Structures are given as structure tokens and as C-alpha cells.
Regions:
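A short, active-site helix/loop in glycosyltransferases that binds the activated sugar's phosphate group
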Residues: 15-45, 50-55
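Acidic donor-binding loop of glycosyltransferase active sites
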Residues: 16, 157-171
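A short helix/loop element that forms part of the nucleotide-sugar donor recognition site in Leloir-type
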Residues: 34, 56-74, 130-131
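A conserved mid-protein helix/loop that constitutes part of the nucleotide-sugar donor-binding site
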Residues: 79-105, 128, 170
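Membrane-proximal helix-turn-helix segments that form the acceptor-binding/catalytic region
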Residues: 2-18
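Glycosyltransferase donor-sugar binding loop
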Residues: 50, 84, 113-129
């Protein structure tokens, strides 16, 4: 990072209390901004929480599930494997597609649907690369690329397996 960027980012260390959302962020702050910290400043980790009411599967109704599956062009006759996260190389979408191909070799093709759910945020070249990879493995009928979902709790509920395939440490 440039010196200007480091100085700009150091503004956060001027507070009396600095809260990091993960051990990764805590270590990053200590490593990169230690010269801005002193013994009077307190640095601590408070992990992000989740709203358990929002993710309560009993609050979702079957008609909403059917609408979502129709929107995704999925019949619920097969299992659904979901990879949520914006489209970026370190989120592991390429690894996921390659893994789907390997699972297909073991289970037979089209035994399940795979949903890659997340915005490309203008990275259309990366999305095209993922689509080409899925075509190369002949997975076009099986993999769904979904740009956005307003109801992630519902997306999790209709899915049988949720995958995190990140290839680098997450900030949270």
C-alpha cells in the first residue's frame, strides 16, 4: 500500500478503543499500524454476530421457497449446493467449480444443482471466466450463477449444503 493509504487508514488508530471484527483484522492492525498505537490505546476483538431470528428456518414459508427456486430455474428434485459470496478470485469460485466436476465423476453428472450466488460488482471478465470453466467441464445445466438474493436466509434454507471455498483469510 502507498504511504498516503497507510496514513489515511491510520486514522482508525487515533481512537481510545479500537475494535477488530476478527483475529485476522486484529493481527493486521498490530502488524501494519503499530507505530500509531501506544499503551493508552486499547485494541480488542469483538466477533461479528448473527441475527438468529432472521435466520430461523421456521419463519420461511414454502410458497417463498418455491418462488425462489423458480427464479433460480431449479426443480427441488435434486440437492442444492450453495456457494454465497461476491465474485472475486479469492472467494474460491474456481475451486468450487473444479470440485463440482470431481464430485460429478464420483456421483454421476447432474446429481445435484450448484448455485454460485453473488454479484460480480463489475468484474464481468471474472464472471465470464467462471462461466467458461463451467462450460469446459460441461456443467452449464447444473451450475446456476445468481447475481443477487434479497433473502439470504431463504437461500440458505432451500440449500442442502453451504460451501465456503475462500482461498485466502477472510477479514471477518
Amino acid at each position: 500500500k502507498s504511504n498516503i493509504k497507510k496514513i489515511y487508514n491510520s486514522v482508525m488508530t487515533r481512537a481510545d478503543l479500537i475494535i477488530a471484527g476478527s483475529n485476522f483484522i486484529f493481527s493486521h492492525i498490530k502488524k501494519n499500524y503499530s507505530k500509531y498505537l501506544n499503551e493508552k490505546k486499547k485494541l480488542m476483538v469483538i466477533f461479528r454476530g448473527i441475527n438468529v431470528d432472521y435466520f430461523d428456518p421456521t419463519t420461511k414459508i414454502e410458497i417463498d421457497e418455491k418462488k425462489l427456486l423458480k427464479k433460480w430455474d431449479i426443480e427441488k428434485d435434486k440437492k442444492i449446493i450453495l456457494l454465497p459470496g461476491r465474485l472475486t478470485s479469492w472467494k474460491g469460485q474456481e475451486v468450487f467449480i473444479e470440485a463440482i466436476n470431481l464430485v460429478n465423476i464420483e456421483l454421476g453428472y447432474e446429481a445435484f444443482y450448484a448455485v454460485i450466488l453473488g454479484s460480480d460488482q463489475g468484474r464481468d471478465l471474472y464472471k465470464k471466466k467462471l462461466i467458461r470453466l463451467s462450460e469446459q467441464y460441461r456443467l452449464s445445466k447444473q451450475i446456476r450463477f445468481i447475481d443477487h438474493c434479497k433473502d439470504m436466509a431463504l437461500a440458505y434454507k432451500v440449500s442442502d449444503i453451504i460451501v465456503s471455498a475462500s482461498t485466502e483469510p477472510e477479514a471477518f
